[in-house]
Amino acid sequence: MNRLTRSIGAVGVSLLFAGSLAGCGGSSDSAGTASAGPMDASKANLPKTEADVNGTIDKSKVKKSLVVGVDNPYYLFHHDIEVALSKGYFKEFGIDTVEIKTIEDPLPPLIGGSLDLALYDTDTAIAAARKGDQNLRFLSVYLGGEANVLGVGKGINSGADLRGKTITGGQFGSRNDAIIRQLLRDNGVEPDRDVKIVSTGGQSNERLQAVITGTVDGASIQLRHRTVLEKAGGKVLFEETREVPQSGWSATKLLQESPETVTAFLAATLKARQFITDQANKEEVLTIMRAKKFDIPTEYADAYAAENAPAYHVSDGGFKPADMEKFIGDQIAYKTVPEGTDWRQYTYLLPLWRAQKALGLPLNPALADM
């Protein structure tokens, strides 16, 4: 995912946001009311300089209990919250409890109001905002790297061996489906001519098992699956990695009712992420997550350095605008995002900038880059 840059003057026009949100420059949260409607961007107190960003979180305005949705049961998508709870980071910013609900698609309950925030695919959230919920906003990147990996079963050692075989990238129309097709083309294999592409549900763990059991001959899998697949007699045939702001946090009702809470949530989880991406803390993080009953076999633990690298599990929650521009452009081409979508219109970065400033981190994206 990649991006183009625009002048700071464009921020006031393109970063539209729902509700009367707290201004960057002051500590006031008085406009964050549930009754507020979409705000005229000309009235928005958006930051023009870093000095305008208020890094002080008023805990008296923070909601004490939150319910958030995550689409993946793998520990990587839960450990920011569990570590923040374990180490007291949420309480530091005024939040007492956070309940995580694992839901295959957390956007409907987020839009319906039963979730406060959702961790989900960036493009899907932006597309949902464009198509329906005008108050939904993408807030911060969670995973900023993408590994496009084709795992195959026994006896497949080259692109030529794939001819006539069955491959899945997950559900038709998903990003995984699109990028596995591109990976095949990049390696001289034409989808739907040289191989049979099938649609399957579930996450990457289910696709791995489908390869191991022979249900399919190859599938889009994750880096952590390499050792497991090799022990079963398979292998990674093709792979590529790139910077892509593929998933992150979004909010709608909470952003209108209590923008201070959104900032507090991001500050606590980013503080946890700073701890997690410090490789010296690997064993403590894994101990916390195993105590929470997450299944982390040795093969998955061995992938910790790759999956929790600061550029992959983005340590500051930010992104390069050019990467986002490229990503959303690709998704428009894949028809998963409506034609003409301007991602800036459905992205609201003030809570992220405030959280970064609260933690003493540089603002990312930089104001000048937006």
Question: What annotation goes with each model-predicted range?
Answer:
Residues 42, 329-370:
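Conserved C-terminal helix/tail region of periplasmic/extracytoplasmic solute-binding proteins
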Residues 98, 104-106, 196-198, 302-309, ...:
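Short linear loop/turn motifs
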Residues 1-22:
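Sec-dependent bacterial lipoprotein signal peptides
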Residues 32-200, 217-220, 236-242:
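Short, glycine-/small- and polar/acidic-enriched structural segments
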Residues 78, 82, 107, 122-125, ...:
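Extracytoplasmic/secreted envelope proteins and their assembly/folding machinery
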Residues 197, 203-294:
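Pocket-lining segment of extracytoplasmic ligand-binding domains
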Residues 21-36:
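Bacterial lipoprotein signal-peptidase II cleavage site
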Residues 258-340:
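Secondary-structure end/capping motifs
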